[in-house]
Design a protein with these regions (language model features):
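A sequence-level detector of short, solvent-exposed, charge-rich linear segments
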Residues: 34-38, 61, 115, 132-135
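A broadly used, surface-exposed interaction patch
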Residues: 51-84
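N-terminal ordered "arm"
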Residues: 1-57
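Long, compositionally biased intrinsically disordered terminal regions
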Residues: 72-210
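Generic detector of ordered, mature protein regions
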Residues: 17-19, 31-32, 46, 53-55, ...
Length: 210
């Protein structure tokens, strides 16, 4: 039987808020729960082709399970117990980023990202089609972050939309803090106050079979 245990009620509430945002963006979304050393990390895909993640203290058994977001949300918000059955039956599509090898690049004021997001939303509304904003707009680099001799990290608009859509920036006023940009050779990560978004920096090449 699948069990998710998050003893701290505040952290259960944080995880519930994370899952609620996931469901609001996509009713059919899945959440992948992975156990760490005394922690549980939740992963979800967003409509922006960006992963969202949040870590809380707790346990999950089995240690790597994918569940429907709606069922997990019900378990967290209705049962309100330390330990709940998060459901089962999900099949995760795609890969997750590595757990190690991340290098911090720089900290960016959350208020600055909020301003960039608002400008991006205005442009997206002007250019939205039947399927929403075009991919070319979402892929536009809106922020370039660099440190020392390391390659610059180019942050596309879709990452900011994911941060905003998941509510990770919170109240992005003057005292909203910073968003930490980290990277590996092929992934980028933006850690904000209430969660993080992750996206591949390098698109995997298709395998051609002759």
């Amino acid at each position: 039987m699948t069990r998710l245990t998050v003893p701290d009620p505040d952290e259960r509430g944080d995880l519930g808020a994370f899952v609620a945002r996931v469901v609001r963006l996509d009713q059919a979304a899945l959440v992948r729960l992975r156990a760490g050393e005394g922690t549980v990390t939740a992963w979800a895909a967003t409509p922006f082709d960006v992963l969202a993640t949040r870590t809380v203290h707790g346990e999950v058994e089995p240690g790597d399970v994918t569940v429907p977001a709606t069922g997990l949300l019900t378990a967290l918000t209705v049962e309100r117990a330390d330990s709940v059955d998060p459901g089962a039956g999900g099949l995760w599509q795609g890969e997750l980023p590595p757990a190690e090898g991340w290098q911090p690049v720089d900290d960016v004021p959350a208020a600055e990202l909020e301003r960039l997001t608002e400008r991006g939303l205005a442009v997206a509304r002007e250019n939205a089609g039947p399927m929403g904003p075009p991919a070319s707009l979402l892929d536009q680099t809106v922020l370039t972050v660099s440190a020392g001799a390391r390659p610059a990290v180019k942050v596309p608009l879709r990452c900011l939309f994911a941060l905003s859509g998941m509510g990770f920036l919170g109240d992005a006023g003057p005292d909203a803090g910073v968003v930490r940009v980290s990277a590996t050779g092929s992934w980028m990560r933006l850690d904000a106050r209430y969660g993080a978004v992750v996206r591949r920096r390098v698109t995997a090449l298709p395998l051609l079979v002759g």
